[in-house]
Amino acid sequence: SLVAKSVFEIGIIVASFAFAQILTETYFGRMSDRKAKRLLFIRVGFILCAITFGLHYFADNTTYLIIARLGAGIASGIMIPPMLAYAYEAGKGKSKVASVISFHALGWLAGIVAAGLANDEKLIFIVSSCFFIIGFIISLRLPKIQTEKIVEKGIIKKIIVKNKFLFSSLLIRHIGAAAAWTVLPIMLMEYFGAELYQVSMVYVANTLTAFLVMNLMSKRIQIQNITKFKIGI
């Protein structure tokens, strides 16, 4: 690694992003419910992501990179929950959220391809920032929809308790996936001498498959009680 000196430092850098993101998603997801202003949080998130991801270009040591990753985690955490909620409320369909998540994988694919084409560890962050600016511009054309404010207290705890087994299985799954995908590019580059574009090819295979499978599965989702789905129980 050009910045981190050990796999442990890389793990800390990766974890800092996830830690900031989960806390921010929980808080701002709840705030978007209370304020019923999905588009505001989505657009603010795009702007902050453009700034924080662009700042990665200037991170030349572990400390600065951790700060940049924390900022990126906070910025992305502001927009993701409102975006999923907006997709559900705008689509009024049981498979819309799954379709949006599949396009999340497609976005990863496009970003990975861009990283491979750039083949530069610093330039890609400028490219990433530009993508977020484009996303913000597109978000300006999204129609405003009527959303009811959800002000019930203790709803997060209720959702977690109600779905504890689902959340536990997802947590275990993501722990394994994060561990594998954190170490894999290091292994490919240090032990097999892979170039950045070759690493991106491996990631493209994963994200392309995820996009196709998610779209296929979204058409088969059946939900009996839409209201319960909306509030997460």
Give residue spans per PLM region.
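Helix-to-loop junctions at the C-terminal end of transmembrane segments
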Residues: 24-36, 212-226
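Cytoplasmic helix-loop-helix junction between adjacent transmembrane helices
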Residues: 68-104
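Short amphipathic helix-loop junctions that connect adjacent transmembrane helices
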Residues: 1-9, 182-198
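Structural signature of the two symmetry-related core transmembrane helices
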Residues: 40-54, 227-233
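Helix-breaking motifs and short loop linkers at transmembrane-helix boundaries and internal kinks
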Residues: 36, 58-60, 193
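Residue-level signature of mid-helix packing/kink "hotspots" within the transmembrane helices
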Residues: 18-26, 108-109, 207-215
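Symmetry-related core transmembrane helices of the 12-TM Major Facilitator Superfamily/SLC fold
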Residues: 124-140
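Juxtamembrane intracellular "pre-TM" segments in multi-pass secondary transporters
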Residues: 142-172
